[in-house]
């Protein structure tokens, strides 16, 4: 009896932990960690990602980068400062204008 309860708790814990943070596209992270109804709820660094019945805020820049300029000319290169890239909506739906993203320390990796 105790073994089946432990197994059930373990499986439930793995299921819940795998679901956490899965609201955003694979290369973006949830920030701020709130539910949203519109893009305005998320601030200028994030957009509202609909995911089933729950919409969450996801960053416009990929994981490991920061936004350095709020606009750029996607898909043409340029328009961003050195060592930064122009990033668009990760699934191509045009939910936000392309932004310039850069690694905080471009010379270290």
Curated annotation (Swiss-Prot):
It comes from Margaritifera margaritifera (Freshwater pearl mussel). Residues 1-21 form the signal peptide. This is Uncharacterized shell protein 3. InterPro entries: TNFR/NGFR_Cys_rich_reg. It comes from the Eukaryota. One of its GO terms (cellular component) is extracellular region. It is found in: Secreted. Its main location: secreted.
């Amino acid at each position: 009896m105790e073994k089946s309860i432990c197994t059930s708790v373990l499986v439930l814990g793995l299921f819940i932990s795998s679901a956490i943070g899965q609201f955003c596209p694979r290369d973006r992270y949830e920030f701020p960690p709130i539910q949203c109804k519109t893009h305005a709820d998320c601030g200028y660094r994030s957009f509202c990602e609909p995911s089933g019945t729950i919409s969450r805020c996801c960053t416009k820049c990929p994981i490991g980068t920061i936004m350095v300029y709020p606009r750029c000319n996607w898909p043409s290169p340029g328009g961003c400062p050195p060592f930064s890239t122009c990033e668009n909506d990760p699934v191509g739906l045009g939910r936000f204008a392309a932004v310039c993203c850069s690694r905080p320390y471009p010379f270290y990796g």
